[in-house]
């Protein structure tokens, strides 16, 4: 998950930083740092990704579509 995908997914879920932090059991500072491009431990990124995937987010990786990377929500 790229930082921009994290922000896109969070916005798609209509979550603030606090909601993602709570769902992933990380601090709000951690979410903010990641979205600004700071490198985090992979398990921390995985926790945020898993929390959003549990709410229906699908992460689209570069190469999966002609449009590049992004996010979508399962209907």
Language model segments and positions:
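Recognition helix of helix-turn-helix/homeodomain-like DNA-binding domains
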Residues: 25-40
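DNA major-groove recognition helix of helix-turn-helix/homeodomain DNA-binding modules
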Residues: 42-60
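A short, glycine- and basic residue-enriched loop/turn
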Residues: 17-18, 37-41, 63
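Short alpha-helical DNA-recognition segment
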Residues: 15-29
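Hydrophobic micro-packing sites on short alpha-helices
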Residues: 10, 20, 48-52
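Helix-turn-helix/homeodomain-like alpha-helical modules used for DNA recognition
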Residues: 57-75
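Short basic helix-loop element that most often maps to the first helix and adjoining turn
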Residues: 4-19
């Amino acid at each position: 998950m790229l930082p921009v995908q994290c922000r896109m997914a969070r916005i798609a879920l209509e979550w603030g930083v606090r909601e993602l932090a709570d769902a992933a059991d990380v601090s709000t500072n951690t979410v903010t740092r990641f979205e600004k491009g700071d490198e985090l431990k992979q398990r921390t990124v995985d926790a945020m990704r898993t929390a959003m995937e549990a709410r229906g987010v699908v992460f689209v990786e570069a190469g999966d579509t002609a449009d590049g990377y992004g996010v979508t929500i399962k209907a």
